[in-house]
Amino acid sequence: MTPSPEAQTLPKAQAVEYLRDHQVAVEVGFSLPTFLQVEVPASLSRTKVERSLRIGAYSYTGAGTEMRSARIGRFCSIARRVIFGQAEHPTGYVSTHTIAFNPTAGFASDEYFAALATKRPVPYAGDVVLGHDVWIGDSVIIRAGVSIGSGAIVGAGAVVTRDVLPYEIIAGVPAKRIRMRFPDELAARLLQTGWWDHDVRSLKDSFDRPEAFVDAFERERASLPKLVFATITMEQVDRGTFTVRTYEAAAPG
């Protein structure tokens, strides 16, 4: 794919409309992050995004979800009120309050706060990373830096503080393994297919039979076209302006 010749700089409101006009479901007034990369189609309806987001085709988020620095694969199902990678406070300083590390927060105009507050480093835990075909239940909290493998399921209300294996089902506070979705051999074969990267319309009748699906995929792999989607990137130029680029892609035949 190559950058579209229509790359342009747009005010925020027009950039949001551009997404809406190109199969990305967002509400009017959507808060664009500093950097956005989205394969179309995708849905971010009533979702708050900060810093950066990369999201794959057919992934969607529920109302009230908040994301901060996330990378999400294709075909991910994210329910309502999910919290991704919120900022953390240092625990080794005298105080966990912003007065110990962020002089621009909240009370910056207060004389005492301004005199005492000092900018100090807060280690960055990293992006939240979801593979492909991940299902996140309602009201889940995912700590910054956590990676969740393809095919995993996170139960509603869980607090995820560790990495999650592909096809692992976890739940609870803190989240712990409930079971694996499939036996190890089948999970490994299913992961190896990378079906989310291929046009598998010819295999749709076996979607409810994972072993039959994998057998058919392995037989037909060479004839299954790769899926390539149009991709939109938006990068903030200043407070109210974004550079928009569209990478075009032909639909599979």
Regions found by a protein language model. Give the residues of each.
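Acidic, glycine-centered active-site loop in nucleotide-sugar glycosyltransferases
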Residues: P166, A171-P174
